């Protein structure tokens, strides 16, 4: 995650947060070179993950259902959206243990089992190990 390039700072309080603290936090984020965005209500996953999770879920469902291969799903996403990375590149960046742990007892156990069989059991955990859906330079 290249925070110095993709420099959004999501600022979210809780019902117990003094509203007077939001402005100084937003200002501090700006001083650090971030682009602050205030989230008005408490939301698990904030904004970015709330937008990202449906994409990753759709991509994993397309793969598990045998509809398309990761490279083709990524190609469609990157070309159509002008995005620098596709969903399976994002999975590799996040690390495959994270979607496995989220999915195995949650919303997507089929994908979690797929990850375990095809990648995790083979030591392919994503960028951190040099290979996941894609191969990377030695970590």
For the regions a protein language model found, what residue spans apply to each?
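Short alpha-helical interface patches
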Residues: 1-3, 55, 101-104
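A short acidic, often aromatic-flanked loop/helix-cap motif at beta-alpha or helix-coil junctions
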Residues: 2, 44-46
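Acidic/polar active-site rim loop that often engages polyanionic ligands
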Residues: 2-12
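Short acidic (Asp/Glu) and glycine-rich catalytic loops that position anionic groups and cofactors
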Residues: 4, 56, 81-83
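Short, hinge-like loop/turn segments at secondary-structure boundaries
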Residues: 11-15, 54-57
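NAD(P)-dependent Rossmann-like dehydrogenase/reductase catalytic/cofactor-binding core
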Residues: 16-26, 30-43, 60, 64-139
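Structural/interface elements that position substrates and couple domains in central-metabolism enzymes
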Residues: 31, 48-58
